[in-house]
Amino acid sequence: MKLKQLLTAIKYRAEQVPDVDITDLVYDSRKAVPGCAFVCLRGANADGHKYAKMAAEKGAAVIIAEEPVEAPVPVILTDNTRLALAYLSAEFFGHPAEQMHVIGITGTKGKTTTAFMMRSILEAAGHKTGVIGTIGVLYGDTLIQTDNTTPENHEVQKFMRQMVDAGCEYCVMEVSSIGLKDHRVAGFTFELGLFTNFSEDHIGGAEHKDMAEYMACKSMLFRMCRTGIINIDDPNYTGIIKNHTCNIVTYGYDKSADFVAHGEELVTTPGFLGVRFSVTGKLNFTADVAIPGKFNVYNALCAITACSVLNIPVTAMQRGLKTVKVKGRVEPVPMPGDFTLLIDYAHNAVSMQSILTTLRAYNPKRLICMFGAGGNRPKVRRFEMGEVSGNLADLSVITADNSRYENVLDILADIKVGLAKTDGKYIEIPDRREAIRWCIENAQPGDIIVLAGKGHEDYQEIEGKKYPFDERVVIREILDSMK
């Protein structure tokens, strides 16, 4: 793309604009390539303006900056390079958001689950759908790992372009508060913006200085979308939609909502844990959700409300929710016996308490929790996780997680400090593969077993190296060896 064409996306100042073709947009000088435009971003730990010369020496054809920099190539000045990168990226990749329906989801909890519920419903209706979020970028059989829930705006545009080229009609995106703060989703309009809930999180450090800023960042989505889907049961919802510019559609248990949930009940059969509830208001039907926990009624109702606005048939909503699966989030793994085996990402005391409390409500014969703890992380997490599992599980199976540079036995010793505060039973099997084998071989009818900690991860980190370790593959290998 010609530089002059690219720059039509932003306001800028320059003595001259060379007649050059731009091969890529780059904001990390280490990734500069011949013919690229290097955009100087200020981050929490580094300032891209200091690396402009390095980028030019590696072949950058032009530097885009907020202030004059020393470089042997033309320098284009603009007021906010982070915002400029968003608009430049949209132009460079051909405005992919205008070629499909883009849905953004924000909230403290529930973004990932709601995103996958949306995907399951939309694909049940015959619409190819991509997802950008915590688990990475997913469309078709393609899964790309990412570092952040909401990637940098250049990556967001690149991934959306890939989705359009792959035939996606919809893109469902988790939109974090930091992503909004850093303009990672600027440069396009969301068709829908979904709000799940709001509670204290991400305060301090390089994130948000206080709750007011956190809420203000969340609220930005509702000035960037055409229609907002809002949980009116959340006491903070009025702050979230303050100064909104979109249409508002509401959901919740509150009878004044446009879409109302009621009559929820837990559903269980061997290998299946879920929840059933009724929807009234603008639609009237019953939904079965293939993810356990009454709190998932909110996530499902959010997805239902959004899909109704998109004119998706109720039958597709029902099919999608009944078959939804979120990798690593209370993910069921088919078993030959009359017990339930789940994989979950719970890796701290809060998330472990949530998942074990949820599963306890299904009245299992035994609730077995297999878990470890990350190495080179605060020891207090291990104490707390041991105490939570000891109090809530009938049996804890403690094993390795990502031990990193620590000895697994030292980590397990710390977990046992927490277990010792309870009357909970436990066994210790340091090898995670063997711990999984033990759980399967010793399962009894009616048991619920949760393998906690790894979730969607497909590796184990030991002594600085990541070794392949996908629990789904491990389980399949164990079952094959038992035949």
Regions found by a protein language model. Give the residues of each.
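Short glycine-rich anion-binding loops that position phosphate/pyrophosphate groups of nucleotides
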Residues: 43-45, 177-178, 199-201, 234-235, ...
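ATP-dependent carboxylate-amine ligase
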Residues: 1-13, 34-37, 245, 282, ...
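A short acidic, helix-capping loop that chelates divalent metal ions and anchors anionic groups
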Residues: 71-72, 139-143, 200-206, 377, ...
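N-terminal leader/targeting and accessory segments in enzymes
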Residues: 1-87, 91, 223, 264, ...
